[in-house]
Amino acid sequence: MASADDYFSDFEDDELDKLYEKAINKSVKETITRRAVPVQKDLHDNVLPGQKTVYEEIQRDVSFGPTHHELDYDALSFYVYPTNYEVRDYQYTIVHKSLFQNTLCAIPTGMGKTFIASTVMLNYFRWTKKAKIIFTAPTRPLVAQQIKACLGITGIPSDQTAILLDKSRKNREEIWANKRVFFATPQVVENDLKRGVLDPKDIVCLVIDEAHRATGSYAYTNVVKFIDRFNSSYRLLALTATPASDLEGVQEVVNNLDISKIEIRTEESMDIVKYMKKRKKEKIEVPLLLEIEDIIEQLGIAVKPVLQQAIELGIYEECDPSQINAFKAMQQSQKIIANPTIPEGIKWRNFFILQLLNNVGQMLKRLKIYGIRTFFNYFQNKCTEFTTKYNLKKSTNKIAAEFYYHPILKNIKNQCENYLSDPKFVGHGKLQCVRDELMEFFQKRGSDSRVIIFTELRESALEIVKFIDSVANDQIRPHIFIGQARAKEGFDEVKYTRKHAPKGRKKVERLHRQEQEKFLEAERTKRAANDKLERSARRTGSSEEAQISGMNQKMQKEVIHNFKKGEYNVLVCTSIGEEGLDIGEVDLIICYDTTSSPIKNIQRMGRTGRKRDGKIVLLFSSNESYKFERAMEDYSTLQALISKQCIDYKKSDRIIPEDIIPECHETLITINDENEIINEMEDVDEVIRYATQCMMGKKVKPKKAITKKKRVQENKKPKKFFMPDNVETSIVSASTLINKFLVNESGGKQLVTSNENPSKKRKIFKALDNLENDSTEEASSSLETEDEEFSDDNNVFIAEGQNGCQKDLETAIIRTGESLTTLKPLHNFERPNMALFVNDCGLPTKIEKNVKDIRGNQHNLEKEKNCTVDKNNMVLSLDDWNFFRDRYIPEGVSFDVEPNFVQYTKGVKVPHCHKVSKIITLFNDESNDNKKRTIDMNYTKCLARGMLRDEKKFVKVNDKSQVDNNSVNHDSSQSFTLSNAELDDILGSDSDF
């Protein structure tokens, strides 16, 4: 017979693999090759720790079975290539490879990535009958652009498409079930996959735009991981202009998206050069102003002692004070904090030194790249913040105090204030270059041309707008274009000082403080309103307001609309304008600053030269030229490494059977009227609205007042959990997972099935569960005790007196009637417990049904004789009475009315009965060695022995059938009278006490 361990054995590894891979047609075969490698050994011929003696090579052979998608074999013989646009060689090649492999398409911006994706989607729409095609983009504007382009290229019927952007989940299940082509953000797809609304097995084609974002835990990565768990037979096409900044980043994207092939093109590629518009690049080196160099020198003098200390401690590399780098200082500080071996005191000292160097590095960067105005705002804020905290003793950083209280910083502050007080002062040479370039450009091209200026900092963007506006040229109309976040507020010295000032102990002081705070708050509100009113009067007022409060999507949309319309012809953008927005045709790009990221640089330059020639002006100061050239060289090297197959790719399913090789049919696609309408729309929200109405099968109508109607709530579909095939989805009880065994007569184990599970029937007395006993006797045995535990002898005898007459005792029975006189509960502490007394012959006195003579001191039972209760409310049922009659001795049982604890003992404890109270008092006296109690006990014992010796009857039973509780006298001294001689004889006898 199998042992118990066999029933609880774990799954084998191959069983687990089969369990997780039942739903996919992918099989992996691994071949491991091991080779011995030389290792270092000690004198005892033992391998040193950490040495590997074997080198392993793992080769994985991946194969795919037939796809689970329902294919249209009549359409598999060819694929359609639209000829509505110019046929380009690189697009033709990439489309052909993307149909049969998971491809990462990396080509310059404006080179038709959307056309490639649309063609792939069109053919998988033709080849499959029910499968889903999904196009994902990270933002709403990008999704709107893609649905506009795809429907205008492929001609896919609009009733088969859906756009999923809104947070509302209304009709989402129905949309996924009835449509085939979807345009959505990756977050929507991820959420619907997790909710069970979208079946991952239904997906046959997934297009990912801006694929360089597929790193870490971004939604793109999560979507692909989720689909891979259930489906390996789907095509993935990733689109980007720059896959990553380095080889490791490219490999991460390839791994996360299951890429099998990278199709990369540069502006110098042979098959793309002829289609590229001319982009003239102009690099301008801008020297630093003398005022800037003077401030840099003074900052170097102030920070030199701190820098020298950092160099001596080995936490920062040796350099000139003017070359302090904020990024390097931040990296070093993070390493120090993460190092657990450094003592806490040394760790925080080094951290504060590097933190100060980081702040100085930020000052130098702003001064060299953006100018004195941007520098002074940051410098003044940091100085004010530290000095205020240090004066209030909220900071004890002496290293930073040595710098911020340096006398030379006061000189820097005074110089900057003098410079900025002059309205004609130019804070940096780049501003003059921007003005000259714009003047020359608009004189040649006219005011109908468009210009974008890129900068990283918001303060710098606003400064550029104000400076351009000061030129007072009607041809140049600038506006800022930034993100939605509000500007960071500077350090408020007054607010911080008042917050940490003494609150005041007296009520008058607290009230005075509250009045001051209200007054200051009113002043701030009034000043903010006045400033806003002044800004609205200036031409740059909207830009200033946007810089303070940020630009929401509505404001961004309005600015872009005005830019396309010509109300503004110069946009000063932060990184928000680098990708993802359809800003339109731009003729001039000015990069006010540069970064070390080739992705950012390429995205910026890709905003021009799409449909006509453009110009790019790169402004360099300090070491920006070196950073730009190095970034572009690294990207060129990266492209070469990708072309040399230095990436570890993943094999993907062909989906189409191997014996079918589709031919290319170049076809002119006929676009229907609805798709043509979408293609002609310019407004993003209008495109989304129209596509949504087409998705819902509605005609576009002007908005009207809608009368609300009561909706009949439909039954929601239960959430669906996607699992591998042939998996038990129902709930399994724990008892079915355990095997039960019994030992049979031969001593072996016998498996017990669920039908053979033995169970003992036990008699339960429900009435006994409700009894409240107040006795010192031991509790009766458990109600679950079987009948056999009680004695079978129904005849009980009592020997009494010397004669020892024995007679059968009859159990006193109270017969239940249809109605009984209602009795109020008697308080046990007012009377002794009602036991059954025996007469001279030992026979019990029967207690009649009429119990009207039983009464308490506080309840008048005579007034309630006529009250009746149902017989079911008695203490015991008939079966319980019979059980007591057969099993119990009458002297040990007393029957009483069930007490109503809820009514009479609601707020107090139920006291003990008279008998129990006397026993408790007795034992307390014995524990306390009460002599009076001892004498009384001896006296009682002696009286009892004397009476037994004389054979006197000491129990007298009233012949009457009714017993009065008050007639019972428990004082033994009053029951008998003895002479003095008899008493002395008794007291002189031996005593057990």
From Swiss-Prot:
Gene Ontology cellular-component annotations: nucleus
UniProt short sequence motif DEAH box, positions renumbered to this chain: 209-212
PROSITE patterns: HELICASE_ATP_BIND_1 (PS51192), HELICASE_CTER (PS51194)
InterPro entries: FANCM/Mph1-like_ID, FANCM_DEXDc, Helicase/UvrB_N, Helicase_ATP-bd, Helicase_C-like, P-loop_NTPase
Domain (Helicase C-terminal) ranges: 507-655
Primary location class: nucleus
PANTHER family cross-referenced by the UniProt entry: FANCONI ANEMIA GROUP M FANCM FAMILY MEMBER, FANCONI ANEMIA GROUP M PROTEIN
Protein name (database record): ATP-dependent DNA helicase MPH1
Native species: Saccharomyces cerevisiae (strain YJM789) (Baker's yeast)
The organism's taxonomic lineage, starting at the top: Eukaryota, Fungi, Dikarya, Ascomycota, Saccharomycotina
